[in-house]
């Protein structure tokens, strides 16, 4: 009897009261098992609803305070179920999916008090879409509305709050250190591409206070890139860089895809736009040991690169550059114009 008691105590210490084992998933580590090259309007709408609901649940449900669930793999399970189904069936699947994470407590009074405070940001996220019963149906809408008031005191594994010093004070900043990077996926399938879109769009939707300043309505970005990522000739890095540039923010920079888009090599010149013309602004930086005369001088104007006018390259590069004003766009464009995919002498 003593041996049995000791064994039971040992087991209870390994699995404390209230602890739930992590959910077991299929192996999605390299493939989402969901791929498309074309999507029609009905599938696009289903995926847009899924992306919104998935992101809202991700940042509002208390079940994600620990590592019991993997939201990336949850998405991969949902994609084949939702993509081609009728709206009513889609909504039922998503409502049942939310129910599967279990019960939770709400803290409505606490949140209402915060929202009534004068310190709340004027342009906070508009989540009125969760009450759209015409699109979501009554049951799914009710679950999302209740989820808004869920008690999230335990935190969220996918986002935490960190602080950085600015103007002699500490300012809060979201830190997405709970996301898996998937470094080995250089050419991900459509499911993983959608994961990129859904992750990024929802990060901006809930944590980027300047999204109302972008040139393009942020609500239009989600369906656009759901469609773009499905295109068979669309480069993943190319579309990711284009999507990030939609923020029109100098801080939104992504190094991936620079070589693929603009070339690995660069003409050794520093240039800038002066009155709309591409001008050499510092001397030629070719090493002295080349023993040749520098082909460019300060003040020279570059009118074409490889027989194509500068205006052509401006049009090609502009959509991949994230800057908040025209001067910064031109400065970044000047650098990219002189890149090339071939290594050859001037």
Where are the language model's segments positioned?
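Bacterial Sec-dependent N-terminal signal peptides
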Residues: 1-24
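Flexible, low-complexity junctional segments that flank or bridge functional domains
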Residues: 20-346
């Amino acid at each position: 009897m003593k041996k049995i008691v000791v064994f039971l105590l040992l087991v209870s210490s390994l699995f404390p009261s209230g602890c739930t084992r992590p959910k077991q998933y299929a192996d999605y580590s390299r493939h989402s098992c969901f791929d498309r090259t074309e999507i029609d309007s009905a599938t696009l709408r289903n995926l847009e609803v899924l992306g919104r609901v998935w992101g809202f649940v991700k940042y509002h449900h208390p079940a994600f305070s620990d590592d019991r669930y993997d939201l990336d793999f949850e998405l991969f399970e949902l994609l084949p179920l939702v993509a081609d189904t009728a709206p009513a069936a889609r909504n039922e699947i998503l409502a049942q999916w939310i129910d599967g994470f279990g019960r939770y407590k709400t803290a409505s009074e606490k949140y209402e008090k915060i929202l009534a405070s004068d310190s709340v940001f004027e342009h906070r996220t508009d989540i009125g879409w969760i009450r759209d019963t015409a699109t979501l149906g009554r049951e799914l809408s009710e679950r999302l509305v209740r989820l808004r008031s869920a008690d999230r005191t335990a935190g969220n594994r996918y986002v935490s709050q960190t602080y950085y010093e600015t103007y002699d004070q500490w300012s809060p900043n979201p830190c997405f250190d709970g996301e898996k990077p998937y470094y080995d996926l250089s050419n991900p399938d459509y499911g993983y591409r959608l994961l990129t879109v859904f992750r990024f769009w929802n990060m901006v939707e809930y944590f980027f206070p300047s999204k109302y300043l972008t040139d393009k309505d942020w609500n239009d970005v989600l369906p656009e890139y759901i469609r773009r990522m499905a295109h068979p000739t669309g480069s993943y890095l190319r579309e990711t860089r284009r999507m990030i540039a939609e923020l029109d923010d100098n801080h939104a920079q992504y190094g991936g895809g620079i070589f693929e888009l603009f070339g690995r090599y660069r003409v050794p010149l520093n240039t800038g736009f002066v009155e709309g013309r591409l001008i050499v602004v510092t001397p030629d930086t070719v090493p002295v040991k080349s023993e040749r005369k520098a082909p460019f001088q300060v003040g020279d104007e570059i009118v074409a690169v490889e027989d194509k006018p500068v205006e052509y390259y401006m049009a090609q590069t502009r959509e991949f550059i994230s800057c908040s004003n025209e001067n910064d766009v031109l400065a970044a464009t000047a650098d990219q114009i002189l890149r090339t995919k071939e290594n050859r002498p001037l």
